[in-house]
């Protein structure tokens, strides 16, 4: 009856502590016969018993649901461990993963976990929390309450022996074959006897070893639970007034008068529960049975003796009329004693596990604060001394042999060299009047001869507006064309411009640059326009994208290129002399490069008033752009679309059979979750193929992993019939030559299926597409100013994106659009995308700004954008560029920054390349940088583990993901050079490499080689990949290569530290934390150092940290020699020297502190200065032109450095245990 009243009260929301039970749970609360149906605490009041009555036996089916309460965590502080222990003890297994399945559902604010329990009965419980780990613990606590109600736990949550669990399970009807041979009962955790006089909480009596199963949590749980390293935790406890706990001065035996016991019981009304929880938390045990034992004697008056074996043997005696009363009084006396020792907080609640192990934490923290000892072999020390005596640092700084000041510093700014022709890339020379007249007449003749081809071109909606458009462009410096999808603006307007100029006899003056947001659209549109102009004028149309270029002839030229290419052209021709028009297509996408380009083009109007700017968009906020350019005219052009029939999620589920996807339907109808069901996508594509109209299928997916996932599912489903389908992935990871296949017409009887990101959303037309499957999602980079890391998130697209995607189905015939989201979601979508400039890191943008307009501050320059970024974000970018030595304190480019300006990649990677040229290990760094731009491995959701194993094998014992890249690419180059086709395919298959990505990487290496040559770092581009070239003299020195990479990426440095404390207060001494300058991070399982059982060095470098689900983690890392960190990083060092021993540390970071004898430390400091001098010399002069004597000095210095880094790390070893 009490249970029924409780359920009714809960359903009515009376209890503030427990959530209402699910309807399926009500009426199924009876326990099995012979088992206790309650989990009430000893000696509680009747009201408390009614309020806390436990649920009974699970229902007969698999659907019983019980919602967890946060308060249950007080009763079951380590619920997941307790559940594992019960099932493990009962079944004789080491882990209960198969019997406990956690299913996660991500809500907009709360995480939900449904825990499926498969023993002793199938039952489900639910938990909620702001983090996944919190929700799991809530669900596990609810399950523990069930277990206790079923009699599977004792009154104090203690476990039974395996034999008793066998009897209990028989009553539940558990099948006999699920029982394994039971293991003998084991004590919870070992402990040591201590004298109470010496007790310090967390001291020797506090157990420092965590329970094994808690240490071996799943990796995703580790990501969610949050960690604090030992040093950070100790600094927090010093600020906590409760941290300094008192020593014990009591004896080992206590027996007081009854009044004292009664007062203690008043203060601790549930003392036995409190004692059990304290011991369980302190000892990481699932039971306190073996550490607190009662012995009660007597008839009328009961005398109870409590022997407490933690934190040391203590005995408490009390009396009472009943056994329970006497035991509670003794337990209350024990609680009073623990509180006097500081082992219970002021609210009479247990402390955290870490606080009970505070002495061990302090000892570990002290170990971490000690500097690491360095021992350099005596022969190397003597070599360093000899070198420094021969080439003293201070006198060399002022040597006149190089005359490093004034005019002899290389002029690498924007004013260096002749202007470049933006169309052809050759030096710009204006046409003479005679040349212009001759070329214009030739173009007119060619135009007249092209008649039949022009007639074949279909009439497009933009054609009737030609005069309006052309007159507006002629009369206004800027014009915005708002052309609907399908109006023909992308292909036709450049031709209309060329036609007017040619037919008016001034065709040589028409040189149009048309930007496209992506490489594939620039190439495909150029080819389309070239075809429409016909063979006579085909050579007047060209394209230029990264790694591929086919420029048009000079005069009367149409050049299609990406925005990045035009930005590069502006460096060598700031006023775009020789260009008549710039057409910016698809400006509504608001990528960061386009917004940056608009700043430059707006300022360019003063330098080149004859230049005409045309902005084109289908769905953008065109009035905003008009206002940005001073109210320029907006010309609206209607488009033409064939009818497109739309289906939304509810329609799609009805077609496929709604019962097959209950979770998907419920999920989208009720939540804002951005999760894509790849099985649903696959089934929809197969359904369209089986029942839909003939024609191609274009499927929009968020990213590469989803593309590969759907591709593999389709291939498996199609099986033997795969030859009847052409499945084509489209992604920026794929080289242009492979992407062009999407435009080809498949053979008769073959259906084309294109799996693409938003790369296929605009500018390109795939003629045979009839069906569009729109996931409604895309990847979007977002920058967290607080953590200073980026997060590539899957988010909903905007309504403008939905319109564009739908339009791909109706370009050439009627079509169908299948939206994998409900109609209600469409209304919630933003009208336009958030501009990229507002949500991404700005280092590249600031560097570009300093190249184009060095006289302006970064904030001043970027304030002129259509949407100005956060000033704090700009300042952070400036600070980073100053930290890596690219900008000085006045925000001018340094000599290093001028070199970086030539290299088209992230500033830190560009710095690594520059340093690699100076340190003569260039080729491996070019490979690393290229692979960080494009992953060479053929990785997918299904084969990640296999790829990780291959990377580990390729890395050997280098401890480096980056050197795994080098070995993979070098092996491929070797196979290409000497082996046949079969050997090449075997190499790709064995090493899980992706041939198109390797081709792209090869192209990047070639491009970087050209950049390095332009930066005066090598004598000729081919030297960069030539093993015998001076720039590769030390390319086989792995520690040097990793050190140079670290020097480029610094301050991206990680120090590995032993021991951590979870956010829940659990101390894990055998785990490791990864500390950076900004705080703790996690290593992703994809880096080989995540699973390494032994690290040769405590220091790692990395390129990028990414934020996911509230945690920051690193995907790529390399172990680096501590001496490389000391010698190759920027900034100053700090030395403390007592004349015998000295410590040296980085002034800008607490991540490196080394100790050695005074002579060793002094020599290392001088060696560091010599290396800094070498870098500065090399940056101030053409590297290949340095005098022979300087080349010789640098060669000796690098040989010495390589030998030093070959030495062992010695005391820097860190052993990782299996519980990490």
UniProtKB/Swiss-Prot annotation:
Reactions catalysed: ATP + H2O = ADP + phosphate + H(+)
Highest rank taxon of the organism: Eukaryota
Domain Helicase ATP-binding: 470-638
Pfam families referenced in this protein's UniProt entry, alphabetically: DEAD, DSRM_2, HA2_C, Helicase_C, OB_NTP_bind
Region (Disordered): 12-66, 176-226
PROSITE patterns: HELICASE_ATP_BIND_1, HELICASE_CTER
UniProt binding sites for ATP: 483-490
Top-level EC class: hydrolase
Gene Ontology, cellular component aspect: cytoplasm; mitochondrial nucleoid; mitochondrion; nucleus; ribonucleoprotein granule
E.C. number: 3.6.4.13
Domain Helicase C-terminal: 680-853
Ranges of residues in domain DRBM: 79-147
Location relative to the cell: Cytoplasm; Mitochondrion; Mitochondrion matrix, Mitochondrion nucleoid
InterPro entries, per the entry: DEAD-box_helicase_OB_fold (IPR011709), DEAD/DEAH_box_helicase_dom (IPR011545), DSRM_2 (IPR056755), Helicase-assoc_dom (IPR007502), Helicase_ATP-bd (IPR014001), Helicase_C-like (IPR001650), P-loop_NTPase (IPR027417)
Locus of motif DEAH box: 585-588
Keyword Nucleotide-binding: yes
Keyword Phosphoprotein: yes
Biased composition (Acidic residues): 214-226
Residue numbers of Phosphoserine PTMs: 252
Subunit: Identified in a complex with TFAM and SSBP1. Interacts with AGO1 and AGO2. Interacts (via N-terminus) with ZC3HAV1 (via N-terminal domain) in an RNA-independent manner. Found in a complex with GRSF1, DDX28, FASTKD2 and FASTKD5.
Its biological purpose: RNA dependent helicase. Plays an important role in the assembly of the mitochondrial large ribosomal subunit. Required for optimal function of the zinc-finger antiviral protein ZC3HAV1. Associates with mitochondrial DNA. Involved in nervous system development and differentiation through its involvement in the up-regulation of a number of genes which are required for neurogenesis, including GSC, NCAM1, neurogenin, and NEUROD.
Similarity comment text for this entry: Belongs to the DEAD box helicase family. DEAH subfamily.
Full protein name: ATP-dependent RNA helicase DHX30
């Amino acid at each position: 009856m009490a249970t029924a009243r409780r359920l009714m009260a809960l359903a009515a929301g009376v209890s503030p502590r427990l959530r209402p039970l699910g309807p399926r749970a009500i009426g199924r609360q009876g326990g099995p016969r012979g088992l206790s149906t309650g989990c009430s605490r000893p000696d509680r009041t009747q009201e408390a018993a009614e309020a806390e009555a436990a649920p009974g036996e699970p229902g007969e089916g698999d659907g019983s649901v019980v919602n967890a309460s946060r308060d249950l965590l007080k009763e079951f502080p380590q619920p997941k461990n307790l559940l594992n222990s019960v099932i493990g003890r009962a079944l004789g297994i080491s882990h209960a993963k198969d019997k406990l399945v956690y299913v996660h559902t991500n809500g907009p604010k709360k995480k939900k976990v449904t825990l499926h329990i498969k023993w002793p009965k199938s039952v489900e419980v639910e938990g909620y929390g702001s983090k996944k780990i919190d929700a799991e613990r809530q669900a596990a606590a609810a399950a523990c309450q069930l277990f206790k109600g079923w009699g599977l736990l004792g009154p104090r949550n203690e476990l039974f022996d395996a034999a008793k669990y066998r009897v209990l399970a028989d009553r539940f009807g558990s099948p006999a074959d699920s029982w394994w041979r039971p293991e003998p009962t084991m004590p919870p955790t070992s402990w040591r006897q201590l004298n109470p006089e010496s007790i310090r909480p967390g001291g020797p009596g506090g157990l420092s070893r965590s329970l094994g199963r808690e240490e071996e949590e799943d990796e995703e749980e580790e990501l969610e639970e949050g960690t604090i390293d030992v040093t950070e935790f100790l600094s927090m406890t010093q600020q906590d007034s409760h941290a300094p706990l008192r020593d014990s001065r009591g004896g080992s035996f206590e027996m007081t008068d009854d009044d004292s016991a009664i007062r203690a019981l008043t203060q601790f009304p549930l003392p036995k529960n409190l004692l059990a929880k304290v011991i369980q938390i302190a000892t990481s045990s699932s039971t306190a049975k073996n550490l607190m034992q009662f012995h009660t004697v007597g008839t009328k008056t009961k005398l109870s003796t409590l022997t407490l074996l933690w934190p040391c043997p203590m005995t408490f005696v009390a009396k009472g009329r009943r056994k329970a009363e006497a035991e509670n009084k003794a337990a209350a006396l024990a609680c009073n004693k623990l509180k006097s020792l500081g082992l219970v907080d002021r609210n009479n609640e247990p402390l955290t596990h870490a606080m009970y192990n505070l002495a061990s934490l302090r000892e570990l923290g002290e170990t971490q604060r000690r500097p690491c000892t360095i021992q350099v072999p005596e022969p190397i020390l003597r070599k360093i001394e000899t070198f420094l005596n021969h080439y003293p640092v201070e006198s060399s700084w002022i040597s006149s042999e190089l005359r490093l000041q004034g005019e002899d510093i290389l002029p690498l700014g924007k004013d260096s060299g002749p202007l470049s022709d933006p169309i052809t890339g050759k030096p710009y020379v204006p046409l003479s009047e005679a040349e212009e007249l001759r070329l214009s007449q030739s173009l007119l003749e060619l135009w007249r001869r092209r008649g039949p081809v022009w007639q074949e071109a279909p009439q497009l909606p933009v054609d009737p507006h030609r005069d309006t458009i052309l007159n507006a462009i002629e009369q206004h410096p800027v014009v915005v064309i708002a052309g609907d999808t399908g109006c023909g603006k992308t292909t036709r307007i450049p031709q209309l411009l060329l036609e007017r100029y040619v037919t008016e006899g001034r065709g040589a003056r028409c040189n149009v640059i048309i930007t496209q947001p992506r490489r594939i659209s620039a190439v495909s549109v150029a080819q389309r326009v070239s075809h429409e102009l016909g063979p006579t004028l085909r050579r007047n149309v060209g394209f230029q994208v990264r790694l591929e270029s086919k420029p048009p002839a000079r005069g009367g030229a149409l050049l299609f290129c990406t925005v990045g290419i035009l930005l590069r052209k502006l460096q060598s021709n700031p006023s775009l002399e020789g260009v008549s028009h710039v057409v910016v297509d698809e400006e509504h996408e608001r990528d960061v490069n386009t917004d940056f380009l608009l700043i430059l083009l707006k300022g360019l109007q003063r330098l080149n008033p004859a230049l005409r700017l045309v902005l084109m968009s289908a769905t953008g906020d065109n009035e905003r752009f008009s206002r940005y350019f001073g109210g320029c005219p907006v010309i609206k052009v209607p488009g033409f679309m064939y009818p497109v029939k739309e289906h939304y999620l509810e329609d799609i589920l009805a077609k496929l059979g709604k019962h097959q996807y209950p979770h998907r339907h419920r999920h989208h109808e009720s939540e804002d979750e951005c999760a894509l069901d790849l099985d649903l996508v696959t089934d929809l594509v197969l359904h369209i193929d089986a029942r839909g109209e003939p024609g191609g299928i274009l499927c929009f997916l968020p990213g590469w992993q989803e593309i590969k996932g759907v591709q593999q599912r389709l291939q498996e489903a199609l099986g033997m019939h795969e030859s009847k389908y052409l499945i084509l992935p489209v992604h920026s990871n794929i080289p242009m030559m492979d992407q062009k296949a999407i435009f080809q017409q498949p053979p008769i009887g073959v259906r084309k299926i294109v799996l693409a990101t938003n790369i296929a959303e605009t500018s390109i037309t795939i003629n045979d597409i009839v069906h569009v499957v729109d996931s409604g999602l895309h990847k979007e980079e977002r920058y967290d100013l607080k953590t200073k890391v980026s997060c590539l998130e899957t988010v909903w697209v905007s309504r403008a994106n939905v319109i564009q995607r739908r339009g791909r189905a109706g370009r050439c015939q009627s079509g169908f659009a299948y939206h994998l989201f409900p109609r209600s979601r469409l209304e919630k979508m933003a009208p336009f995308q958030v501009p990229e400039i507002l949500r991404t890191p700005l280092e590249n943008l600031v560097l570009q700004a300093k190249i184009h307009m060095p006289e302006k501050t970064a904030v001043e320059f970027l304030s002129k954008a259509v949407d100005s970024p956060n000033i704090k974000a700009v300042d952070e970018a400036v600070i980073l560029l100053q930290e890596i030595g690219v900008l000085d304190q006045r925000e001018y480019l340094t000599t290093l920054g001028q070199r970086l300006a030539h290299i088209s990649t992230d500033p830190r990677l560009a710095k690594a390349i520059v340093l690699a040229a100076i340190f003569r290990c260039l080729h491996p760094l070019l490979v690393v940088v290229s692979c960080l731009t494009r992953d060479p491995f053929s990785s997918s959701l299904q084969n990640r583990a296999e790829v990780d194993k291959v990377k580990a094998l390729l890395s050997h014992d280098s401890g480096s993901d980056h050197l795994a890249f080098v070995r993979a690419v070098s092996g491929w180059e070797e196979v290409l050079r000497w082996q046949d086709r079969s050997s090449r395919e075997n190499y790709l298959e064995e090493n899980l490499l992706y041939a198109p990505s390797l081709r792209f990487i090869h192209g990047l290496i070639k491009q970087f080689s050209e950049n390095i040559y332009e930066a005066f770092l090598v004598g000729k581009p081919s030297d960069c990949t030539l093993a015998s070239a001076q720039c590769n003299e030390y390319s086989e020195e792995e520690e040097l290569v990793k050190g140079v990479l670290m020097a480029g990426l610094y301050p991206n440095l990680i120090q590995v530290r032993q021991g951590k404390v979870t956010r829940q207060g659990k101390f894990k001494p055998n785990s490791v934390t990864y500390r950076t300058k900004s705080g703790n991070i996690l290593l992703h399982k994809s880096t080989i150092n995540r699973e390494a059982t032994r690290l040769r060095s405590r220091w790692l470098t990395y390129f990028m940290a990414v934020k996911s689900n509230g945690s920051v983690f690193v995907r790529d890392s390399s172990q680096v020699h501590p001496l490389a960190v000391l010698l190759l990083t920027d900034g100053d060092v700090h030395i403390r020297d007592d004349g015998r021993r000295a410590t040296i540390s980085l002034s800008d970071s607490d991540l490196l502190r080394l100790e050695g004898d005074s002579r060793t430390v002094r020599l290392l400091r001088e060696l560091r200065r010599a290396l800094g001098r070498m870098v500065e010399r090399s940056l101030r002069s053409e590297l290949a032109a340095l005098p022979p004597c300087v080349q010789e000095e640098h060669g000796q210095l690098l040989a010495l450095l390589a030998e030093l880094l070959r030495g062992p790390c010695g005391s820097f070893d860190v052993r990782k245990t299996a519980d990490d």
